[in-house]
Amino acid sequence: MPATPDSAKIGFIGLGIMGAPMALNLLPAGYSLKVYNRTDRPRVQEVVDAGGERAASPRDAASGCGVVITMVTDTPDVEAVILGDDGAIHGVDAGSTVIDMSTISPKLTREVAAALKEKGVNMLDAPVSGGDVGAQQGTLSIMVGGDQAVFDECLPVLEAMGKNINLIGGNGAGQTTKLCNQIAVSVANLAMAEALMLAAAADMDVQKVLDAISGGAAGSWQMTNLGPRILQGDFAPGFMVKLQQKDLKLVMEAANDVKLALPGASLAHQYFNIVERHGFADEGTQALIKAYEAQAGKEARAS
């Protein structure tokens, strides 16, 4: 249970594929919720039915809450829901903490943190990894940037949504770490797609190949979680291609800022471009293999 009445009330902004299950995990942990989403999705009503209070705006969602969590799509969205005319900054009380769990620009994160600090409001950037399954099960990895004391105070909130929770450094460090994560994730996805496509093109039993290689040194989260979905033709999104592309764009921008070449991430970015061009932007990132299937004229599926 939360230690104080102040921290027991949480404003949650953004109830999409990730945000809704994350919010739902806070309720059984003893927190009360005020929730807001920019569109009236069915998931909003699901959270309200579970005990959340519907807010009329980000400002309203933040009002009276000791913690405000944002989980939206992109950098401009975070700027709008926190700093916009009806943003959370206009409703949140001094001494409260805003936790942005979106994946956005580290530069904008630092700007938002500075604006909130002027109002006496703390900020943590706490992007996540683990996909929709991790969000549903409360097992997300959470990469945090901010002050140690603020992190310690908010740790019980984060523990209701995740398991592997690390404070990396000051504001922006969480976002930079998430970009490092997205490099590793996207390149692992690319490697898995190439391996499965070679097996299919060579007329192998792709299921047997996946079973064989995922149990050894080639094993990865992608092999375990996305490989079986590919073989069953399941491309429903846990994390959409278009969102992976948004993150890879941030990776490329960050690399450019420090004059660093990232050929693996760049190649993954280009192959996801092919997937998007074929009309699969709203599918899960396992749809990366469709770029290879188009090239080979053959699908990688279980027989």
Located regions from the model:
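Small-residue-rich helix-loop
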Residues: 204-216
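Interdomain hinge/lid region at the active-site interface
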Residues: 171, 175, 219-286, 303
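NAD(P)+-binding Rossmann beta1-loop-alpha1 motif at the extreme N-terminus of oxidoreductases
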Residues: 1-70, 96, 101, 132
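Hydrophobic residues within alpha-helices
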Residues: 22-26, 112, 157, 198
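Hydrophobic beta-strand scaffold residues
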Residues: 33, 54, 122-124, 165, ...
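Rossmann-fold dinucleotide-binding core
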Residues: 10, 104-182, 186
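Rossmann-like NAD(P)(H) cofactor-binding subdomain of soluble oxidoreductases
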Residues: 58-63, 67, 75-140
